[in-house]
């Protein structure tokens, strides 16, 4: 059995027994153990998700293969409440945003594209940066880990979803994109990751210093940019370029501990 053959399409078609065999092989390769294979709630698009424990830390099995990541801004139809928020909050606030929300999204979201990725293990929980970003890759490598590249992060977060957010098209009503509370952003994603759930606390660096996903450090909320733009940092394809620039600059050297990284383990 080769984990190189574990594609997302194949995972979709597998029964629980086959999923278990692949997950147990992944666990064997990293000297870990399969702690659970569970059915995924309906609406997530996947039948099962597998979590493996290695050295006291939990990792989700992320199938690879040819997958689609990014977001098709041109095809995006904002929901009525999103359009209203943009017009009456974001534009009316005088922040200088583009008149068309599609232009605003195109500035920060990566384009729709097809990529080929390996199957990997990815930490269920991201970890706080232990040092300035430039030193993190070497620190991870010393433990047999690495950072995800942007394509891998988007695939792991969206799990094949084509919507703006990993949970769907809408900004959840009556909840905030930060702090305690309930909502789809607080639930594990289809692969079992706790990811992109708090604009203040869940921002993650990647192997590319120009891409930070899962949050903006609260910039949009603090700025009062409006509901749509306050949720937008949690969009699966949002590379948060301003946040990435901040983290990579001199100010980021003093605040790196407020950001995260998600360890990845390669599989044979």
Can you say where each PLM-predicted feature lies in the sequence?
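Surface-exposed recognition segments
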Residues: 113, 196-268
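Low-complexity, compositionally biased segments
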Residues: 8, 18, 34, 75, ...
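Functional-site microenvironments in short loops/helix caps that host divalent-cation chemistry
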Residues: 135-227
């Amino acid at each position: 059995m080769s984990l190189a053959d574990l594609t997302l399409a194949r995972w979709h078609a597998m029964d629980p027994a086959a999923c278990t065999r692949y997950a147990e092989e992944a666990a064997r390769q990293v000297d870990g153990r399969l702690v659970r294979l569970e059915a995924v709630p309906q609406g997530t698009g996947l039948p099962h998700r597998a979590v493996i424990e290695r050295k006291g830390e939990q990792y989700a099995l992320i199938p690879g293969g040819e997958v689609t990541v990014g977001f098709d801004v041109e095809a995006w139809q904002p929901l009525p409440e999103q359009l209203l928020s943009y017009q009456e909050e974001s534009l009316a606030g005088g922040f200088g945003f583009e008149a068309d929300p599609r232009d605003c999204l195109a500035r920060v979201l990566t384009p729709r594209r097809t990529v080929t990725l390996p199957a990997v293990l990815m930490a269920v929980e991201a970890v706080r940066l232990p040092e300035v970003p430039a030193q993190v890759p070497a620190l991870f490598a010393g433990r047999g880990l690495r950072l995800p590249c942007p394509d891998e992060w988007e695939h792991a977060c969206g799990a094949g979803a084509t919507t703006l957010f990993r949970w769907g098209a809408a900004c959840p009503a009556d909840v905030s994109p930060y702090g305690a509370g309930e909502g789809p952003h607080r639930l594990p994603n289809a692969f079992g990751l706790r990811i992109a759930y708090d604009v203040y606390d869940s921002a993650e660096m990647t192997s590319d210093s120009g891409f930070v996903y899962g949050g903006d450090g609260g910039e949009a909320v603090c700025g009062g940019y409006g509901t749509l733009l306050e949720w937008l940092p949690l969009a699966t394809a949002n590379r948060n370029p301003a946040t990435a620039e901040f983290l990579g600059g001199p100010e980021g050297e003093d605040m790196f501990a407020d950001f995260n990284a998600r360890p990845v383990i390669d599989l044979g």
